[in-house]
Amino acid sequence: MAASTMALSSSTFAGKAVKLSPSSSEISGNGRITMRKTAAKPKPASSGSPWXXXXXXXXXXXXXXXXXXXXXXXXXXXXXXXXXXXXXXXXXXXXXXXXXXXXXXXXXXXXXXXXXXXXXXXXXXXXXXXXXXXXXXXXXXXXXXXXXXXXSLVHAQSILAIWACQVVLMGAVEGYRIAGGPLGEVVDPLYPGGSFDPLGLAEDPEAFAELKVKEIKNGRLAMFSMFGFFVQAIVTGKGPLENLADHIADPVNNNAWAFATNFVPGK
């Protein structure tokens, strides 16, 4: 250090004094200093869809610009979306989200089953019993539902027997989901994975995050459409696919307005 100081102050600079500690204004200059955040941007979801990514477009943006702190892309807890203020507290929001995911998964299966049964009937598979639309009436009748037209297959004479079987089966599955068992340990009870995910859809974390959002969104849609199926069946006495076929055949006459004055069910 001493040698460099002597070299700097030697006669090579022709008597010009060299400042070894220049002032701060000379270091930084007079330009404005701006600090820029260089954090990595979140990766878009694997499908590139604007609706299921982490920064999903909020459709209710017009109603309330400021999203609540609890609102993720999946559960929009804006004032308009949660009219009943069900997601006001964070703990309640988490519980409601768990219920929504479980009920949504059930509704997605139910809506598929309701449509599938009607599709099978339309494709001339001889289903002896009525479709799901009229099944509630048939279940209370003495003859009961003979699935797949074979009396010996699932010929449930008693609605209580059906109920007991459902309780046992669903109780076993839910018990595995919550407590673990021979199917594997529980990591996350809401999204159990393991044997509950035979296709391995949740192994990639990005795709898994996107699928969670899609599951909730499609589940809400399925719950609402299942409600619609029931209302249609009560009013028109037909299943959803029959109503759709009628509507496509004659969209002007066969639509909701034709039944808007019909308050006698199944007429």
From Swiss-Prot:
Annotated chlorophyll b 5 binding sites: Q166, F263
Posttranslational mods: Photoregulated by reversible phosphorylation of its threonine residues.
Cofactor binding, per record: Binds at least 14 chlorophylls (8 Chl-a and 6 Chl-b) and carotenoids such as lutein and neoxanthin.
Gene3D superfamilies (alphabetical): Chlorophyll a/b binding protein domain (1.10.3460.10)
Keywords, alphabetical: Chlorophyll, Chloroplast, Chromophore, Magnesium, Membrane, Metal-binding, Phosphoprotein, Photosynthesis, Photosystem I, Photosystem II, Plastid, Thylakoid, Transit peptide, Transmembrane, Transmembrane helix
Keyword Endoplasmic reticulum: no
Annotated chlorophyll a 3 binding sites: E215
Primary location recorded for the protein, binned into one broad class: plastid
Binding locations of chlorophyll a 1: R220
GO annotations of cellular component type: chloroplast thylakoid membrane; photosystem I; photosystem II
Residues holding chlorophyll b 3: S158, E174
Chain residues that bind chlorophyll a 6: H247, A256
Annotated chlorophyll a 4 binding sites: N218
GO BP annotations listed: photosynthesis, light harvesting in photosystem I; response to light stimulus
Residues binding chlorophyll b 2: V154, L183
Sequence segments annotated as region (Disordered): 19-52
Transit sequence range: 1-34
Alphabetized InterPro entries for the sequence: Chloro_AB-bd_pln, Chloroa_b-bind
Domains as described in the record: The N-terminus of the protein extends into the stroma where it is involved with adhesion of granal membranes and post-translational modifications; both are believed to mediate the distribution of excitation energy between photosystems I and II.
PANTHER family per the UniProt record, alphabetical: CHLOROPHYLL A/B BINDING PROTEIN
Protein name (database record): Chlorophyll a-b binding protein 3B, chloroplastic
Source species: Solanum lycopersicum
